[in-house]
Regions:
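Extended repeat-based scaffolds of very large eukaryotic assembly and lipid-transport proteins
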Residues: 1-79, 83, 91-94, 98, ...
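Long, helix-rich interaction regions
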Residues: 1-10, 124-129, 133-172
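Positions within ordered alpha-helical repeat solenoids
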Residues: 39, 59, 71-78, 90, ...
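Buried hydrophobic core positions in alpha-solenoid tandem helical repeats
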Residues: 52-54, 85-89, 114-119, 144-146
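Alpha-solenoid helical repeat scaffolds
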Residues: 68, 87, 100-103, 129, ...
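Short linear functional motifs in flexible/disordered or boundary regions
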Residues: 81, 100, 113-114, 157
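A generic structural motif
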Residues: 102-104, 118, 125, 157
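Short linear, low-complexity motifs centered on an aromatic residue
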Residues: 109-127
Length: 172
């Protein structure tokens, strides 16, 4: 919470240092963080939060700092921020960041096409998460899910049932 207020006040360097020294993983803090930011948004300078998050996507070497920034960007309308969307799509190709990026990309107008492109390129947990988010809206996607959806570097069983459900395998 203090870090968000530091960012809100424009104390970016101080916030970055504090973020780099945190001893937890963002996956466990995502929901409480976002709920708190939404609840306290009147006290938070969202423009500063957005500026900090976007800049860290390109400059931070700390995985959890990048995840923090991706979490923050989930609640900011980025449709017109083409450069930022491109950064998010690049980060999505790393299994480490795919889930966080999907939470941003799902808010775009062409979200399913973006998710489909990512799903085709990632192979580990990124593929598993992408399959969860991907909607089988046309034959091209359904065919890909049938032929490739289960292929991942983790465990095919993690996506098998989801793939079967999405393409309505029982009906085929």
């Amino acid at each position: 919470k203090n870090i968000v207020f530091q960012i809100s006040e424009g104390k970016f360097e101080e916030a970055q240092n504090n973020l780099e020294n945190l001893d937890f993983f963002m996956i466990s803090r995502r929901d409480p963080l976002l709920n708190w930011i939404i609840q306290e948004q009147k006290q938070i300078n969202i423009d500063n939060l957005c500026e900090f998050a976007i800049s860290q996507l390109s400059t931070s070497k700390n995985i959890e700092v990048i995840k923090f920034c991706l979490c923050v960007l989930e609640i900011i309308k980025l449709e017109t921020e083409k450069d930022t969307i491109e950064k998010v799509k690049i980060l999505a190709l790393s299994d480490e960041f795919t889930l966080y990026c999907l939470n941003i990309l799902k808010n775009l107008k062409n979200s399913n096409e973006e998710i489909f492109e990512i799903a085709k390129k990632v192979k580990g947990w990124g593929r598993i998460y992408s399959i969860e988010y991907l909607q089988a809206t046309n034959n091209k996607i359904k065919e890909w899910i049938l032929e490739e959806g289960c292929h991942n570097n983790v465990l095919p069983a993690y996506t098998a049932y989801t793939c079967a459900e999405k393409i309505n395998l029982i009906e085929i």
